[in-house]
Regions:
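Sec-dependent N-terminal signal peptides of Gram-negative exported proteins
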Residues: 1-22
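Short glycine/proline- and aromatic-enriched beta-strand/turn motifs that initiate or cap beta-hairpins
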Residues: 17-92, 270-272
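Short loop/turn motifs that connect adjacent beta-strands in outer-membrane beta-barrel proteins
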Residues: 26-39, 73-81, 93-95, 110-118, ...
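Residues on the lipid-exposed face of transmembrane beta-strands in outer-membrane beta-barrel proteins
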Residues: 44-48, 66-72, 84, 105-109, ...
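Outer-membrane pore/translocation modules
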Residues: 57, 80, 84-181, 238, ...
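A contiguous pocket-lining binding segment that forms or flanks enzyme active sites
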Residues: 167-205
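Glycine/small-residue-rich hydrophobic helix-like segments
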Residues: 204-256
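Outer-membrane beta-barrel "beta-signal"
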Residues: 226, 232, 259-273
Length: 273
């Protein structure tokens, strides 16, 4: 796993950009009143398809993702957040994707009892963003972005939340991403948790002309079963629909780069701490 790509523009940008995880690394249960110096999860799994912001690249791109999510509470309002993810492609992807490495670093801010904001800096190497940076814009396979995530738990529907995120990519590819979703996390039994999420993803000035706008709709259901202690197994299933912007991206690329109406399934082994 090579993180050397971090030490180029990041050193110059880190002063002015601090940021959050576009996929909401905001905790599933943010109401815990205790301050914790270290909490998070270590995860390894398998997915039938690789996903990038709701988009499914053409071909059967199976992946073996490995990730670490870390949070350190600084005080009752602020927490430091870190996320590392390596998306490994066991076989040769249909569109020649490189393994994807993602690093997120930032801060989370508690806004009252049931609302949170997170602001972070993300470095991404490889994957669909890296391919697009090289093939569509003639740059390196590394991109950098700043991101803001806002989440609000709904008092009138216990376990439900709404969430929105915006991300600006400022290196490799420049442009905006917006992700709006709603979902629920609930405990069914002592050892079984269930969650679902439904959302829409849009882009602005990220892809070449004609490829922006509504990118995808997605729906995902996840079960989390405690095997023992703090070790869980998490199967999931999701459905992705391709939007008008995604179809425009295929026309710009000149061939089918992303597909819609695709199921994604997988399973992960998770250690929570």
């Amino acid at each position: 796993m090579n993180y050397s790509f971090l030490f180029a523009p990041v050193a110059a940008q880190a002063v002015s950009f601090s940021v959050s995880l576009a996929e909401s690394r905001i905790p599933d249960h943010p109401a815990d009143p205790l301050l914790r110096p270290a909490s998070g999860s270590l995860k390894a799994g398998y997915s039938t398809r690789y996903e990038f912001r709701g988009l499914i690249p053409a071909g059967c791109n199976q992946t073996a993702p490995v990730s670490l999510d870390w949070r350190s509470d600084l005080n009752e309002h602020y927490s430091f957040i870190l996320a590392l993810k390596e998306e490994l492609f066991p076989g040769r992807p249909a569109i020649d994707l490189d393994d994807e490495t993602v690093v997120d670093l930032g801060f989370q801010r508690k806004l009252g009892k049931a609302a949170y904001a997170a602001f972070s800096l993300r470095a991404n190497d490889g994957g669909l963003a890296g391919l697009a940076s090289e093939r569509l814009f003639g740059n390196s396979s590394t991109t950098y972005e700043a991101s803001l995530v806002l989440r609000r738990d709904l008092d009138f529907l216990p376990g439900f939340y709404v969430q929105g995120s915006s991300a600006y990519s400022f290196y490799g590819i420049t442009g905006w991403w917006f992700d709006m979703c709603t979902g629920s996390d609930s405990r069914l039994t002592e050892n079984l948790y269930m969650g679902f999420k439904f959302g829409a993803v849009l882009s602005s000035s990220y892809w070449p002309s004609g490829g922006n706008g509504w990118q995808a709709l997605y729906f995902r259901v996840t079960a989390s079963y405690r095997l023992f202690g703090d070790v869980f197994v998490e199967p999931f299933a999701g459905l992705h629909w391709l939007g008008r912007g995604g179809h425009g991206l295929n026309r710009t690329y000149g061939e089918t780069l992303v597909k819609g109406n695709r199921w994604v399934t997988g399973v992960s082994l998770v250690y929570s701490f």
